[in-house]
């Protein structure tokens, strides 16, 4: 499992078909449930052409009608895919929702294209979504010239209806629905799924957000984290990120990269050592990141935003929607020794081994830093920004997701499954997504496409790999403190 732009995925030559939900104008119903503050902020601030999605190779033969029924069942199950917004009389936004039976999934055969043509066309098909116009999710299929291994299916969605976990859930759900549709399972049975609605969640999120006050603790905590000027911290190394000098720099596409950092064995070892120290694998991975940043760039203090899920209620565990809050992390490793230290390995020279005492200190610092910010995750940052006069956005974001227990995760490699993000632009953001998978630990990153940033990211990723080589049964033993 990797998280990349679609251009990094190997698309075949074949027959391309777009799959688009449609609903008659008269079937939309006024919906009194409120939008979340985050949704409203997204309507105001989202960039044109921004989307997220997923792609996989569906096993089995391509059959258009079962695929249509599977896509319709998926959209019927998840109400957020059948809701949108319209302007109200006061120039604000109000919600309208279509019942499942009002939605039809229409296909349009584009035709047979070469692999290069498919690679050029598919991103534009999937980018045809917007937060202000339904549908907010569209799909496309590619039936290859040699369809023995199945066919490619991808979707693109606006972020207002989708988060990373929803992207991951889709793989198993759509393959299972397609298989059931091919077996003739009735539509009513295909649609049946007891799952919560993100529309309900959004209304509750707004209720909670409206209890916040400008002089309340959540707002003060965020303002303290941001500091003077209420600006988000940047990556501490010179030249990696910087404000765009002009419009041309702001419009420059960012570099995108995916790299495997550790084997399953190495990741499991770090996880076990972190748990033994009263923390989690997340703390261990973030400690490794902090160690690498300090070794490469001399950064003792890292301040970043950690996205975390808000799927607290069990009915939302398998729901499609945007269930994400922000955790401010202020991590200071001053006084902590390097996690790795060099020891004399005899005739083969010096080797780097894990310093147990330093690992304990680093993991404990990470655990405490995340725990300090975690209570703020449940509160809408959009509302906090409004109350606190915060107009800046995150410049350094670090995400960690353990994907191994998502339904179907053990089959993702067979399906060549991948989560997708659209290209980003500018010079002032560095995002890293750490994914723990059945194949090991991967990092996806986007960063400014500048020589300085490329050098910095090359060094950071190599140092992360070097760090993980010290873990696992093939690595070196932990040094005696």
Predicted ranges, named:
Residues 1-47, 69-113, 195-255:
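Short amphipathic alpha-helices and their capping loops
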Residues 1-30, 59-76, 92-136, 338-350, ...:
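A short, small/polar-residue-rich loop/turn motif at beta-strand boundaries
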Residues 2, 46-51, 68, 79-80, ...:
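His-Asp-centered acyl/peptidyl-transfer active-site segments
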Residues 2-8, 108-115, 126-199, 456-470:
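Active-site-proximal acidic secondary-structure segment that organizes catalysis
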Residues 2-4, 37-59, 88-112, 133-138, ...:
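Acyl/amide activation-and-transfer machinery of modular secondary-metabolite enzymes
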Residues 23-30, 47-66, 132-155, 243-313, ...:
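Gly/Ser/Thr-rich phosphate-binding loops and adjoining beta-strand/alpha-helix segments
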Residues 29-45, 115-121, 256-272, 424-437, ...:
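AMP-binding/adenylate-forming domain of the ANL superfamily
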């Amino acid at each position: 499992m990797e998280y990349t732009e679609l251009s990094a995925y190997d698309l075949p030559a074949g027959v391309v078909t777009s799959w688009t939900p449609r609903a008659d104008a008269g079937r939309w119903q006024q919906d009194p449930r409120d939008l979340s503050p985050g949704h409203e902020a997204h309507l105001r601030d989202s960039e044109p052409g921004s989307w997220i999605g997923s792609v996989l190779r569906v096993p089995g033969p391509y059959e258009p009608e079962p695929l249509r029924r599977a896509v319709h069942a998926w959209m019927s199950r998840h109400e957020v895919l059948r809701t949108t917004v319209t302007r109200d009389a006061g120039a604000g936004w109000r919600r309208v929702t279509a019942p499942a039976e009002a939605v039809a999934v229409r296909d349009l055969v584009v035709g047979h294209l070469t692999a290069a043509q498919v690679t050029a066309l598919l991103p534009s098909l999937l980018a045809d979504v917007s937060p202000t116009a339904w549908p907010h999710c569209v799909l496309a299929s590619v039936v290859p010239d040699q369809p023995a291994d199945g066919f490619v299916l991808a979707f693109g969605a606006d972020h207002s209806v989708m988060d990373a976990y929803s992207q991951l859930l889709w793989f198993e759900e759509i393959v299972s629905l397609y298989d059931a549709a091919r077996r003739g399972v009735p539509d009513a049975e295909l649609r049946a799924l007891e799952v919560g609605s993100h529309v309900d969640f959004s209304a509750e999120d707004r209720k909670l957000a409206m209890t916040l006050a400008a002089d309340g603790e959540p707002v003060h905590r965020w303002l303290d984290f941001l500091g003077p000027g209420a600006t988000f911290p940047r990556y501490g190394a010179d030249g990696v990120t910087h404000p765009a000098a002009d419009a041309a720099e702001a419009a420059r596409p960012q570099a995108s990269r995916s790299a495997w950092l550790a084997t399953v064995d190495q990741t499991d070892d770090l996880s076990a050592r972190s748990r033994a120290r009263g923390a989690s694998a997340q703390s261990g991975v973030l400690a490794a990141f902090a160690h690498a940043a300090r070794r490469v760039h001399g950064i003792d203090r890292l301040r970043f935003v950690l996205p975390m899920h808000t799927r607290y209620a069990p009915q939302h565990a398998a729901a499609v929607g945007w269930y994400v809050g922000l955790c401010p992390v202020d991590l200071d490793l001053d006084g902590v020794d390097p996690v790795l230290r060099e020891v004399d390995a005899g005739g083969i020279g010096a080797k780097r081994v894990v310093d147990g005492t330093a690992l304990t200190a680093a993991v404990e610092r990470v655990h405490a830093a995340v725990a300090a910010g975690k209570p703020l995750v449940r509160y809408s940052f959009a509302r906090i920004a409004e109350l606190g006069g915060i107009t800046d956005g995150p410049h350094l974001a670090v995400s960690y997701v353990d994907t191994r227990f998502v339904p179907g995760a053990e089959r993702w490699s067979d399906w060549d499954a991948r989560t997708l993000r659209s290209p980003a632009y500018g010079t002032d953001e560095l995002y890293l997504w750490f994914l723990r998978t059945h194949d090991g630990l991967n990092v996806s990153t986007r960063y400014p496409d500048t020589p300085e940033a490329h050098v910095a990211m090359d060094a950071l990723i190599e140092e992360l790999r070097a760090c993980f080589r010290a873990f696992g049964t093939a690595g070196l033993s932990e040094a005696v403190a």
